[in-house]
Structures are given as structure tokens and as C-alpha cells.
């Protein structure tokens, strides 16, 4: 009986061990957020070039489903970013930015569900604004130049 209790205790404690996030913030952005946002941003476009005017929009139910799923995925990533794995040690505005991503992504999903081309286009701009505001507050680290000397700061 003691052996069973000891094994159970070890297993229970092993389950309590803190684990690192599966991805860093930069990896989550690069591997998940960026691709999902690209699907949404690219769904509706109005292009005017030397070949004429081009209205890009989802054509099939499957196209619309991809756009809807991208918005739903962005909601989930926003929720992930609010968790301790990503928010711990950051200013409280990190959670506010992440929640703004969730909120606008809900609106984006509804626009896609409704197959509302104009609303998808409009919400794309709002998503971009939310992301840009966060990136202004939390800029990506500037990698060192190839020569080994630090690269100039973005404000220089």
C-alpha cells in the first residue's frame, strides 16, 4: 500500500512541475499569428495597378471558412498571450493588447461568417491597428549587425 501511495505522490508532483511555453512569443507570432493574420488580410483586397482594378474576395464556402478559421485562430492566440507563459513579467497593458486582439478577432469571425466583404476589409484594418499598437509598446529586439557591432536603434 505504501508503494502505491509513494508512486501516486511522485506522479502527482510531476504533474505540478512548471513547464515552459511550447513557443516563445516571437515563435508564436511567426509560426501562428502571422500566418493566420495573413489569411485574413489577404481575403479581401482592392488592387489598382497597370493591368486594371482587381477586387479580391472569397469565392466559395471553403474560402470563407478559411477566413473564419483564421479569425477564430487569432482569438485563441490572443487568449494564449494573456496566460502567464507570455504575460508574466510584462506591464498590465500586455493583457489589454492581447484582449483587444481577442475582441477584434471575434468581430472578424462574425464578418467572415456573414460573408460580409466590406466588414472583413474594415476589420482587417482594425486588426492591423491593434497589432501595430502592441508592437509599438513591445518592439521586437533588434538583432546585432552581421559585423558583430550592434545595429542602430530604430529611433536613430
Predicted segments with their positions:
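Sequence context surrounding c-type heme c attachment/ligation sites in exported
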Residues: 17-156
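C-terminal motif of bacterial Sec signal peptides marking the signal peptidase cleavage site
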Residues: 12-15
Amino acid at each position: 500500500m505504501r508503494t502505491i501511495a509513494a508512486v501516486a505522490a511522485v506522479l502527482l508532483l510531476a504533474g505540478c512541475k512548471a513547464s515552459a511555453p511550447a513557443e516563445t512569443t516571437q515563435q508564436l507570432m511567426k509560426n501562428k499569428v502571422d500566418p493566420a493574420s495573413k489569411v485574413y488580410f489577404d481575403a479581401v483586397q482592392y488592387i489598382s495597378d497597370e493591368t486594371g482594378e482587381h477586387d479580391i474576395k472569397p469565392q466559395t464556402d471553403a474560402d470563407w471558412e478559411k477566413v473564419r478559421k483564421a479569425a477564430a485562430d487569432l482569438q485563441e492566440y490572443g487568449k494564449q498571450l494573456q496566460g502567464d507563459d507570455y504575460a508574466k513579467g510584462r506591464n498590465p497593458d500586455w493583457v489589454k493588447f492581447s484582449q483587444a486582439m481577442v475582441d477584434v478577432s471575434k468581430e472578424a469571425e462574425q464578418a467572415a461568417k456573414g460573408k460580409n466583404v466590406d466588414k472583413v476589409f474594415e476589420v482587417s484594418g482594425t486588426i492591423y491597428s491593434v497589432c501595430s499598437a502592441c508592437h509599438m509598446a513591445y518592439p521586437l529586439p533588434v538583432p546585432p549587425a552581421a559585423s558583430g557591432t550592434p545595429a542602430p536603434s530604430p529611433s536613430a
